[in-house]
Curated annotation (Swiss-Prot):
Enzyme class: transferase
Name of this protein: Probable nicotinate-nucleotide adenylyltransferase
One GO MF term: nicotinate-nucleotide adenylyltransferase activity
Pathway: Cofactor biosynthesis; NAD(+) biosynthesis; deamido-NAD(+) from nicotinate D-ribonucleotide: step 1/1
One Pfam short name: CTP_transf_like
Gene3D superfamilies on file: HUPs
Source taxon at top rank: Bacteria
Gene giving rise to this polypeptide: nadD
Classification via PANTHER family: NICOTINATE-NUCLEOTIDE ADENYLYLTRANSFERASE-RELATED, PHOSPHOPANTETHEINE ADENYLYLTRANSFERASE
EC number: 2.7.7.18
Reactions it catalyzes: nicotinate beta-D-ribonucleotide + ATP + H(+) = deamido-NAD(+) + diphosphate
Family in the record: Belongs to the NadD family.
GO terms for biological process, alphabetical: NAD biosynthetic process
SUPFAM superfamilies documented for this protein: Nucleotidylyl transferase (SSF52374)
């Protein structure tokens, strides 16, 4: 089984997140995409993070279609960091081929994540293009450090079969929805 793991705070979830998940599902030929709703992003203020139940409900509205699963696994595992979650999931499900999914905006700051180099060595990673993030993502410390492990987008369908480190940057139609912009509108409105 080929499973994409799409983690985030989804604060709030929006059509851009759905676009990333759906793009990954199709281009990577995944059987499932699990949206891992983080209890609290360690790089963001807890003051602006909505309650988990509210964010889970928001994700359920966007995670539509066969193979999309919404999970609070990180909360249940007591995991705050992606690297810890990946290690637990890989140990529990050794026959599953996992791929970490992220938007290009996340790759741009990936070097700030705890254990980011270990994440790259733990599972293949798929980066989906996001507006305004392409240059920052492609020149980010993570992209430079793992340039040798970047696969061409034409090989995306077999990325799940790769031995990490392996990653791909997928371009295509862009979706301009943004959690930051949505939060800003809600604050003003």
């Amino acid at each position: 089984m080929r499973v994409g793991l799409f983690g985030g705070s989804f604060n709030p979830a929006h059509e851009g997140h759905a676009h990333v998940a759906e793009t990954a599902m199709h281009r990577l030929k995944l059987d499932k995409v699990i949206w891992l709703v983080s209890p609290q992003n360690p790089l963001k203020s807890s003051h602006e993070t909505r309650p988990l139940a509210e964010r889970m409900a928001g994700v359920r509205r966007w995670a539509r279609g066969g193979g999309m699963i919404v999970s609070d696994a990180e909360t249940r595992l007591g995991s705050q960091y992606t690297i810890d979650t990946l290690r637990v999931l890989r140990a529990r499900y050794p026959g599953v081929k996992f791929v970490w999914i992220m938007g290009a905006d996340s790759l741009a700051t990936f070097h700030r994540w705890r254990g980011w180099t270990q994440i790259m060595r733990e599972v293949p990673v798929a980066v989906i293009s996001r507006p305004w993030a392409a240059l920052k993502a492609r020149t980010s410390p993570a992209a430079r450090r793992f340039a040798h492990a970047r696969w061409p987008s034409s090989a995306a369908a077999i990325l799940a079969d790769a031995t990490a480190p392996a990653w791909v940057y997928l371009t295509g139609p862009l979706n301009f929805a943004s959690s930051t912009a949505l939060r800003g509108r809600q604050t003003k409105g």
